[in-house]
Amino acid sequence: MTKVLVSGGFDPVHIGHIRLFKEAKALGDYLIVLANNDNWLMAKKGFVFMKEDERKTILEAIRWIDEVQITKHSKNPTDMSICAELAEIKPDIFANGGDRDKKDADTNSSSLNPEQKLCQQLNIKMVFNVGGEKAQSSSELVKRAKQNI
């Protein structure tokens, strides 16, 4: 059985995420979605639009997804990567969406950089541009909604 992992904030889920899930599922037999927890979102964006348990419930309802896990980032995390979860889950494939590419993985300041190094150590295949070009932005959706209130 080929396990595929994707990760992200998914706050909120949008069309680009759906394309990511559909294409990632086609890469293997079992798709695990790792949603960044509320601590990670607060550190990255400064707000949480949908709490992690709500995002998890929504993700679990999407037909291409076999399993949903939430990251274990502590409050005010210094490590924004998902290396701990990658080492625990040990997927066969780590699929990255349209806004994450090899250039990003090669950039030392990117959280994808240590993830790429760990994938090499654990013999996890990294795949980029899954789901096509970046189609939408959760942050932009939230911003537009806020402007229309």
What does each model-identified segment do?
Residues 1-149:
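Nucleotidyltransferase catalytic core that binds NTPs
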